[in-house]
Amino acid sequence: MAQSDFLYPENPKRREEVNRLHQQLLDCLSDSFDVTNKLTEVLNMHLGCRLASIEMKRDGTIKENCDLIIQAIMKIQKELQKVDEALKDKLEPTLYRKLQDIKEKETDKIAIVQKVISVILGEATSAASAVAVKLVGSNVTTGIINKLVTVLAQIGASLLGSIGVAVLGLGIDMIVRAILGAVEKTQLQAAIKSYEKHLVEFKSASEKYNHAITEVINTVKHQMK
């Protein structure tokens, strides 16, 4: 038992809690990497993008991994903005506004995009039109993606940001030492509160992101039948 445990008998429990919360954070990070790569694959296949996949940096910090996802999403958003600008340029203003209208049927939106997608991409597929509608013509999906970026940036800037991803494999004491070293011996309780606070938002944002991109993929599969 560490000497501090005699003075703070709750420390062993807190160490276990930090360990558990750290794993939950890593699970959310891993999911966000996977979903971002799935989205990248869809964009490369159907919109002709050349986006690279990303991989969790196991020897990096939480901030470094958050930044990897943020950078990948920003590149995705840049490609989607190009498609949006092309649609705005090629479509009649009334038709373009319909793409942004949540009351319009998705099938009608796909039909609108289908009119000009060949001019934009060089070929016309209903799958490409569906991707454009789900990702460019949906303020809901855009909002979900932006929220994830915001949450990741907040985690990276928090006291958790400098914690190494791999410390979990080195044992609970190593996690504790890493945390204490990173924040100049801030109490375990503060670390737990930080994990809990950010996990609530991260889990919510990650789940919504996963759901939104899964919906895009399912729509594309339906269009390809």
From Swiss-Prot:
InterPro entries linked to this entry: DUF4533, SMCO3
Primary localization: membrane
Residues that span the membrane, as ranges: 155-175
Cellular compartment(s): Membrane
GO cellular component: membrane
Topology with respect to the bilayer: Single-pass membrane protein
Coiled coil segments of this chain: 62-92, 183-207
Keywords assigned: Coiled coil, Membrane, Transmembrane, Transmembrane helix
Name under which the protein is recorded: Single-pass membrane and coiled-coil domain-containing protein 3
Taxonomic path: Eukaryota, Metazoa, Chordata, Craniata, Vertebrata
Encoding gene (name): SMCO3
